[in-house]
Amino acid sequence: MSKNIGKIVQVIGAVVDVEFSDGNLPNIFTALEIKNPNNTDAPELICEVAQHLGDNVVRTIAMDATEGLVRGMDAVDTGQPIMVPVGKPSVGRILNVIGRPVDEMGPINAEKYYPIHRPAPAFTDQNTKVELLETGIKVVDLLVPFPKGGKMGLFGGAGVGKTVILMEMINNIAKQHGGSSVFAGVGERTREGNDLYHELKDAGVLERATLVYGQMNEPPGARARVALTALACAEYFRDEEHQDVLLFIDNIFRFTQAGSEVSALLGRMPSAVGYQPTLGTDLGSLQERITSTNTGSITSVQAVYVPADDLTDPAPATTFSHLDGTLVLSRQIAELGIYPAVDPLDSTSRILDPNVVGEEHYAVARRVQMVLQKYKELQDIIAILGMDELSDEDKLTVARARRIQRFLSQPFHVAETFTGTPGQYVNLEDTIKGFKGILDGAYDHMAEGDFYMLGGIEQAVAKYEQRKLQEEN
């Protein structure tokens, strides 16, 4: 079969126009290959068809740098979208947007390749049953439960522990649920991507994760598509291996940002705040594919950058409408030395509902939040007048709140090398039992320090008894 070959007629930054003089135009989203004779070291440049301009010309978005391209060069129609390797051979590897390995560990000999553009699962295939995905992290399971096949936003500044929580979840899902994880680095710093790779490797979690990177230095075409590449990898594990997959996207804002960079080059009129007019569609086509089916699920954790802390900006505002909950990391809590530094009052989850998690879980979670909220309100009085001026009831509330606050901390498996404390995975029943006991006053005789950086409540009791023995001796 003869190849369908076009000629480059115009190059503007990341946008390349190609003419097919015989009128046999490739479809939208088809990949074209361009061999750049001026750069013989580089493999073929992949461009994705974005528009049909008329006069047998298509406008494409380049997935890599376009330096060295000149008019008249051949562009070969591959007849299919960008295809990426999926399945076992891609696990433990770093891929780029077009599925090529970038970790210098040799080629990926995959048996299956998936197109990055795929339809969302049909309504009949989707599983509408709401289930809780146990993460083994006390504060998350109790106050911000993750829905299986849901989407959670992770909000946090620099250095409050976003990456550590992500790594612990990759570790726990792999060990407890036997699931795979896919990490999409969208427009993030190359240094952070490198750090994550080495941290996952050192923690022994790399063999359960696929990393897909399109960093800040990549052209906008790559950054606008790398999340779809990662999603195709995750869909394989869900649909063919019937697994519960975790998909991490860091950062979902950069996906939108890349789309807006390309949009102007494609000649579209900008909409609000200069974003692309197709903002809702672009994000929707990605988010609708992240869902539970009758055979498996993709649960997504998405780091969300909020430009200028303005939550009404179109990019975060559009993202919010897709999220099932928000996990907010707080610098104030990190400064207290409480990790994971999840803000128990700011974080929300759609499934913290008695019909989903059960009456007991819901009641304990709400009581924990009430006690912490009361403590927050009393902090000003304590700072000015001291504890002695509080009523006996308030003193008890403060004492229990401080125990709860410390019991919300937890040593992580992936941080063992730094802390020297063995990581703990806590079952949901143990988490609920522990907090219920603190609220009911069963552990009022114990010191605050007995609850710090532990797993289940039994460990706190054991720590207390050991301390008592030492004091007696």
From Swiss-Prot:
<dbReference type="InterPro" id="IPR055190">
    <property type="entry name" value="ATP-synt_VA_C"/>
</dbReference>
<comment type="function">
    <text>Produces ATP from ADP in the presence of a proton gradient across the membrane. The catalytic sites are hosted primarily by the beta subunits.</text>
</comment>
<keyword id="KW-0472">Membrane</keyword>
<comment type="similarity">
    <text>Belongs to the ATPase alpha/beta chains family.</text>
</comment>
<dbReference type="Pfam" id="PF00006">
    <property type="entry name" value="ATP-synt_ab"/>
</dbReference>
<dbReference type="InterPro" id="IPR027417">
    <property type="entry name" value="P-loop_NTPase"/>
</dbReference>
<keyword id="KW-1278">Translocase</keyword>
<dbReference type="GO" id="GO:0046933">
    <property type="term" value="F:proton-transporting ATP synthase activity, rotational mechanism"/>
</dbReference>
<keyword id="KW-0406">Ion transport</keyword>
<dbReference type="InterPro" id="IPR050053">
    <property type="entry name" value="ATPase_alpha/beta_chains"/>
</dbReference>
<dbReference type="InterPro" id="IPR005722">
    <property type="entry name" value="ATP_synth_F1_bsu"/>
</dbReference>
<protein>
    <recommendedName>
        <fullName>ATP synthase subunit beta</fullName>
        <ecNumber>7.1.2.2</ecNumber>
    </recommendedName>
</protein>
<dbReference type="Pfam" id="PF02874">
    <property type="entry name" value="ATP-synt_ab_N"/>
</dbReference>
<dbReference type="InterPro" id="IPR003593">
    <property type="entry name" value="AAA+_ATPase"/>
</dbReference>
<dbReference type="InterPro" id="IPR000194">
    <property type="entry name" value="ATPase_F1/V1/A1_a/bsu_nucl-bd"/>
</dbReference>
<dbReference type="InterPro" id="IPR020003">
    <property type="entry name" value="ATPase_a/bsu_AS"/>
</dbReference>
<keyword id="KW-0375">Hydrogen ion transport</keyword>
<keyword id="KW-0139">CF(1)</keyword>
<dbReference type="Pfam" id="PF22919">
    <property type="entry name" value="ATP-synt_VA_C"/>
</dbReference>
<dbReference type="GO" id="GO:0016887">
    <property type="term" value="F:ATP hydrolysis activity"/>
</dbReference>
<comment type="subunit">
    <text>F-type ATPases have 2 components, CF(1) - the catalytic core - and CF(0) - the membrane proton channel. CF(1) has five subunits: alpha(3), beta(3), gamma(1), delta(1), epsilon(1). CF(0) has three main subunits: a(1), b(2) and c(9-12). The alpha and beta chains form an alternating ring which encloses part of the gamma chain. CF(1) is attached to CF(0) by a central stalk formed by the gamma and epsilon chains, while a peripheral stalk is formed by the delta and b chains.</text>
</comment>
<keyword id="KW-0813">Transport</keyword>
<keyword id="KW-0547">Nucleotide-binding</keyword>
<dbReference type="InterPro" id="IPR004100">
    <property type="entry name" value="ATPase_F1/V1/A1_a/bsu_N"/>
</dbReference>
<dbReference type="GO" id="GO:0005886">
    <property type="term" value="C:plasma membrane"/>
</dbReference>
<dbReference type="GO" id="GO:0045259">
    <property type="term" value="C:proton-transporting ATP synthase complex"/>
</dbReference>
<dbReference type="InterPro" id="IPR024034">
    <property type="entry name" value="ATPase_F1/V1_b/a_C"/>
</dbReference>
<feature type="binding site">
    <location>
        <begin position="156"/>
        <end position="163"/>
    </location>
    <ligand>
        <name>ATP</name>
    </ligand>
</feature>
<dbReference type="InterPro" id="IPR036121">
    <property type="entry name" value="ATPase_F1/V1/A1_a/bsu_N_sf"/>
</dbReference>
<keyword id="KW-0997">Cell inner membrane</keyword>
<keyword id="KW-0066">ATP synthesis</keyword>
<keyword id="KW-0067">ATP-binding</keyword>
<keyword id="KW-1003">Cell membrane</keyword>
<dbReference type="GO" id="GO:0005524">
    <property type="term" value="F:ATP binding"/>
</dbReference>
